[in-house]
Amino acid sequence: MLLLAASTDAHSLLLESSPAAGATLSEGPPQISLRFNNRIEKKLSSIRVLDERGASRPATVLVSDGAADRLTATVSALAAGAWRVEWQVLSTDGHIVSGNFSFRVAPSATR
């Protein structure tokens, strides 16, 4: 029974993201960063960034950077509009966990 509880606790849960879910930014972020409740297998994890039409933008996961509970990807310049981040990580318990969130980049102020 105790082993089963320990195994269940090992599933990775997203604790924090940058940008935050639902955020409106003045400019596109250079990186997407995710923090989980435990270690993840970065080499077998991914981040996708999709525009309003569902087209994927290049995102490069930085496998060697940061703490073992963080997944970070660099992204090319993101234009004004709504963006969806889809992530998938391999937990140290061997289970694949995925999720998504959205944020917006506000249009530039015109003079």
Regions found by a protein language model. Give the residues of each.
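N-terminal signal peptide c-region/cleavage motif recognized by signal peptidases
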Residues: 5-7
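Extracytoplasmic/periplasmic copper-protein system
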Residues: 13-15, 23, 96-111
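Contiguous beta-strand segments within globular domains
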Residues: 25-33
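A glycine-anchored, Pro-Gly-centered beta-turn/N-cap motif
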Residues: 28, 79-85
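Short, surface-exposed alpha-helix to beta-strand junction/turn motifs within ectodomains of secreted
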Residues: 33, 38-57
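Aromatic sugar-binding surface patches on proteins
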Residues: 67-72
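Short, flexible loop/turn segments at beta-strand junctions in immunoglobulin-like
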Residues: 75-77
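Short, exposed beta-strand-loop hairpins at the edges of beta-sheets
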Residues: 86-100
